[in-house]
Amino acid sequence: KAEPYRTEGGKAANTMRIVFMGTPESAVPSLQRLLADGHEVVAVWTQPDKPAGRGDKMHSPAIKDFALQHGLPVEQPRKIKTDEAKELFASYGADVAVVVAYGRILPAEFLRAPRRGCINVHFSLLPQYRGAAPANWAIVNGETRTGVTTMFIGAELDAGPILLQHETMIGEIETTPELMQRLSFIGADLLSETLAQLDHLTPRPQHARDATFAPLLTRQHGLINWLSTAATIERCVRGFQPWPTAYPHPNSRRLIIW
């Protein structure tokens, strides 16, 4: 029998067998919180190491570094739709899979494997800003508030039933890295609360008519439109950090505006 842990409110809850799937620094607080809450993280899945920076040296994802420091088994498959990947994922016998900015859409076999489903921590107030870059686009579009959503993952991207949400204001001069740092810790707390209350939560369906989208960023997004208002340009400077950044001319390679 699993030993109970205590939530911040003092309520005991049973630990779970969890597969964690995430990649960037913003996913680390959620994994850290799962360990602090006493859950059994049976595997950590993340993206493969990639070349970056000067000299294109290979860099590992932040989640991989954290997981290895804590003795957790790490998987970095280049493809997840193979029979081998599906069989490995199912073999864990997980209660839940937790996904935080993993960077890939899970196949149906993955969604069916955990006993209690796959839970996503998404950095917006769904159904607003579905997609890969919600914090960036919230700032660029001049939103004054955003938040974090926990949800069950379904077949459609970021459209699954909502479990819990937490709203926060966006600072007038806040950049995307600053906002994401806050949201990552809000997300960790919300994930902890979600798992502790999972037996008592009623998932709420999203309404497609209310959905807005946060598409994947490209370098072209950072090109400043000098016909825009000063306020719009200022939001782009804050919102397109740390990439693609705001730059003044299509041929700009070194001049970056922060």
Model region roles, listed by residue range:
Residues 28, 32-36, 86-90, 108, ...:
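Amphipathic, non-transmembrane alpha-helical secondary structure
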Residues 15-54:
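N-terminal Rossmann-like dinucleotide-binding module
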